[in-house]
Amino acid sequence: MKDTAKHQGLRNQLVTTLEQKGITDRAVLDAIKKIPRHLFLNSSFEDFAYQDKAFPIGAGQTISQPYTVAFQSQLLEVKKDHKILEIGTGSGYQTAVLFMLGAKVYTVERQSELFKTTSNLFPKLNIRPKHVTFGDGYKGLPNFAPFDSIIVTAGAPFIPQPLMAQLKIGGRLVIPLGEDVQIMTLLIRKNETQFEKHEFGEFRFVPLLEDKN
């Protein structure tokens, strides 16, 4: 698993692109500068790994474009040792960004193929999430709640109630809401019953899968 000076140069260019697109969080940009995105992709896409594009990763899923990863990560306002729930491990790239930001990451993946691939990949890259689970993201991880923040990396038609319940007071939930096109939505929990809602424009995500059993 090689990471070369050429890859590093391409990552530096990618970070410049993200800055030009409005990403300002230095810690997020530094994480993206360090993480070998090409190792999270099928080798046939390696030459394109540092373009600001999404790519298929199997099981009908995609690795989000770097801008989207940076945008969601910036909205979370991650602090060191924050306990973060990630719904949709996918390729594991977003997980790696959160880990590099110093978060304790609890991540859930619904697709067994991706779950196996990323579970094998993390140790090779020295990425150490606190907990990697195969399961239904709509349910969250109640046994590990509450969380400082929750990030959903797939489009959802509504905000799953269990996720709202598992957020700490003062916590932030970032979720792309909508059917075909999603509105990036931030919820901040004000108290037991009230949430403050902010919306940040249109994005496109694969749908969040619910366990129908």
Curated annotation (Swiss-Prot):
It comes from the Bacteria. Keywords: Cytoplasm, Methyltransferase, S-adenosyl-L-methionine, Transferase. It catalyses: [protein]-L-isoaspartate + S-adenosyl-L-methionine = [protein]-L-isoaspartate alpha-methyl ester + S-adenosyl-L-homocysteine. It is found in: Cytoplasm. The active site is at S64. GO terms for molecular function: protein-L-isoaspartate (D-aspartate) O-methyltransferase activity. Its EC number is 2.1.1.77. Belongs to the methyltransferase superfamily. L-isoaspartyl/D-aspartyl protein methyltransferase family. This is Protein-L-isoaspartate O-methyltransferase. It comes from Flavobacterium johnsoniae (strain ATCC 17061 / DSM 2064 / JCM 8514 / BCRC 14874 / CCUG 350202 / NBRC 14942 / NCIMB 11054 / UW101).
